[in-house]
């Protein structure tokens, strides 16, 4: 399959009004090795005002569950396998700001050198698909991530369960 066919496959999950903006952001993410949205916007020649990109993401104008299912289907079509291996991982993303979505002081279990035990950060739980490419080697394709709330009843295990349920077919 060609890249254009991959994009067309994913666009089925995107409302027609949002498709152009979605493709611009997707291409920006492909051009940018870090994957950050702000870098993706900087990597493209913007055809729309920055608020258009903000609204697409922040207001969830793209159905994330449907898009993640399409991505999973695409990867399984391109790399067919009998055994599907999904992994769940939680990641702390350090933040300088004191307030924002999901930002709070969290315990860092990684015990990295020159890093305090408690960090001002966000916690993301990610569901990914492991794709075997060669004997003994594999790629990991992130399917969907979920920002953990800074407080409340929804812990990492609850979020992990929701992520698994969202791709169960």
List each model region and its residues.
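Conserved, well-structured functional cores that handle cations and Mg-NTP chemistry
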Residues: 1-169
């Amino acid at each position: 399959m060609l890249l254009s066919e991959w994009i067309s496959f994913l666009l089925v999950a995107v409302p027609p009004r949002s498709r152009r903006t979605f493709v611009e952001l997707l291409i920006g993410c492909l051009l940018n090795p870090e994957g950050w949205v702000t870098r993706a916007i900087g990597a493209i020649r913007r055809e729309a005002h920055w608020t258009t990109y903000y609204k697409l993401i922040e207001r969830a104008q793209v159905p994330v569950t449907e898009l993640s299912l399409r991505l999973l289907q695409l990867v399984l079509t391109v790399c067919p396998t009998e055994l599907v291996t999904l992994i769940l991982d939680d990641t702390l993303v350090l933040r300088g700001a004191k307030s924002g979505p999901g930002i709070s002081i969290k315990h860092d279990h990684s015990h990295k050198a020159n890093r305090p035990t408690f960090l001002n950060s966000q916690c993301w739980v990610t569901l990914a698909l492991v794709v075997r490419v060669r004997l003994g080697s594999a790629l990991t394709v992130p399917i969907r991530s979920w920002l953990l709330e800074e407080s409340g009843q929804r812990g990492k295990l609850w979020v992990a369960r929701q992520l698994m349920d969202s791709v169960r077919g």
